[in-house]
């Protein structure tokens, strides 16, 4: 990627030295991500430009070592709905390294047109993707396309602690579409998809699932889907089409009417003692942390540890509160109207209402928040 600086004869001064430019351009490349790309020293990615640089480095790799470079996200990234070329566009150019989102979110992913292997990642083989949330949309019509919010194709891969908030529409013939992964092929080594969830609505022509569209050798467990799943043949809330010996385990989906044991109501998803407890599966090191209201879905759902900001476009944090000490607010709340906080006031008044805006500390400037205040005891857990 280059950027034009000058298009005329100019004399510049940079770092104490003069540069003479004759009717040309000064070009440059985005700042490289820090790190060396090894597992012990992964590239540190904090901006959309650096993520694009990382993608291009993988997609233009000349050797297998270059496709297995490793990276971590150090901040949430906004792709601004610019057309995205997936990382690892085909099986022959697959990404084979380890990518750790560190709990961050890549927002406003946009993929359209005739992309055959679609997702933030197109094809991943023999590596790992961890602790990553992706939000955006994919809308393609190409035949025999594979698509997932995280990856279109995953072979001998580990995908864990990942979430997709992507809306996916893949309507070409013989598409394989999933909330997390589109297609897991037959392989001597198993692909692992665990502790993941999908919120986005998924539409495919066939082989369409809330977690995986087509699964031949993947082990899928401790996952859930609350998105609407529609398509032709082999459509399911968890896995569209799969081998009998690879059925998902301890996975759940949203339904207020189904009698399937995997179907759970909105109330059960919001209850810490039901779906959240099932997903934890008795593990002390479980990534599942709490139940939080997710604006994208419009209901309260289990989320990962430290994922409070992932589902709010403005970075706000909405979640149930565990009360361990007194709660204070700066001023009274006007029920059904605006909540007004005055500058210079210190939070010093105990409140006993439910579902309130809570402040701790001193307000530095006047702010007015418009919100409907309602009583709902579920939002404060004693």
Q: Model-found features: residue ranges?
A:
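Short, low-complexity N-terminal tether/leader segments at secretion or assembly junctions of large
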Residues: 2-14
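Cationic, low-complexity basic patches in intrinsically disordered or flexible, solvent-exposed regions
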Residues: 9-12, 320-321, 326-327, 333, ...
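Surface-exposed repetitive/solenoidal architectures
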Residues: 12-324, 330
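Residue-identity detector for glycine
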Residues: 16, 315-316, 336, 344, ...
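Intrinsic low-complexity, disordered N-terminal segments enriched in polar/charged/small residues
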Residues: 346, 360-362, 374-377
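Short alpha-helix boundary/capping segments
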Residues: 349-352
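Short, intrinsically disordered C-terminal tails of secreted or membrane-associated proteins
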Residues: 366-381
């Amino acid at each position: 990627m280059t950027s034009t600086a000058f298009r005329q004869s100019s004399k510049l001064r940079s770092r104490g030295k003069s540069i003479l430019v004759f009717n040309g351009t000064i070009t440059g490349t985005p700042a490289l991500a820090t790190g060396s790309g090894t597992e012990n020293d992964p590239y540190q990615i904090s901006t959309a430009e650096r993520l694009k640089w990382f993608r291009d480095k993988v997609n233009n790799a000349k050797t297998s070592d270059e496709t297995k470079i490793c990276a971590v996200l150090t901040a949430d990234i906004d792709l601004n709905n610019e057309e995205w070329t997936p990382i690892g566009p085909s099986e022959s150019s697959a990404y084979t390294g380890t990518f750790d989102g560190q709990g961050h979110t890549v927002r406003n992913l946009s993929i359209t047109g005739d992309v055959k292997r679609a997702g933030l990642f197109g094809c991943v083989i023999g590596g790992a993707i961890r602790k990553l949330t992706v939000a955006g949309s994919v809308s393609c019509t190409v035949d025999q396309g594979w698509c997932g919010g995280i990856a279109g194709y995953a072979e001998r891969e580990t995908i864990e602690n990942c979430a997709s908030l992507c809306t996916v529409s893949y309507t070409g013939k013989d598409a394989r579409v999933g909330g997390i992964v589109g297609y897991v092929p037959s392989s001597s080594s198993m692909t692992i998809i665990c502790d993941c969830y999908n919120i986005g609505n998924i539409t495919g022509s066939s082989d369409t699932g809330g977690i995986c569209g087509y699964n031949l050798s993947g082990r899928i467990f401790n996952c859930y889907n609350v998105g609407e799943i529609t398509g032709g043949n082999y459509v399911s809330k968890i896995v569209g089409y799969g081998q009998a010996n690879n059925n998902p385990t301890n996975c759940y989906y949203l339904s207020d009417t189904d009698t399937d044991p995997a179907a759970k109501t909105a109330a059960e998803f919001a209850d810490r003692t039901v779906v959240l407890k099932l997903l934890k599966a008795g593990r002390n090191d479980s990534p599942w942390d709490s139940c939080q209201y997710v604006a994208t879905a419009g209901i309260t759902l289990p989320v990962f540890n430290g994922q409070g900001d992932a589902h709010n476009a403005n970075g706000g944090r909405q979640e149930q509160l565990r009360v361990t000490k007194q709660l204070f607010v700066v001023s009274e709340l006007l029920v059904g109207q605006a909540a007004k906080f005055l500058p210079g006031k210190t939070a010093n008044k105990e409140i006993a209402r439910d579902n309130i805006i809570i402040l701790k500390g001193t307000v530095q400037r006047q702010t007015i928040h418009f919100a409907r205040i309602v009583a709902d005891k579920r939002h404060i857990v004693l």
